[in-house]
Amino acid sequence: MKNKKSKNQQFAVIGLGRFGSTVAKTLFEKGEEVLAVDIKEEVITEAHEYTTHAVVADVTDERTLRALGIENFDVVIIGIASDLEASVLCALTCKEIGVKKVIAKAENLKHKMVLERVGADEVVIPEMEMGEKMGARLANPL
């Protein structure tokens, strides 16, 4: 018998580049509630198709995050990696206002270390992780 979840989780995906938009689409397709947030209006216009809600906002401002009710989400995924300051400020503020779980994307190991120090619960470096998986697969073909 398959174990069903009693309720959908609520996810906020901040930063809708390739990583963030893919995470948001996948969660939405799996039936989860997804709030998409980005500073670019054209990105948010597109995001309405694959999210529950999509909002243009500056996530470096604590008042903005509070107005979005970000602390009420089960998981916040921060896909901003190219702007180190925005990424770190967003992660720090999310943790300070009570977000239970923050997952953040980093560009490199130093960025990862900073995100961990400000309280991110999980930090991913997608390019590195995929490179490691591919290398392992190529070294051990079936």
Language model segments and positions:
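Cytosolic regulatory regions of ion transport systems
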Residues: 1-142
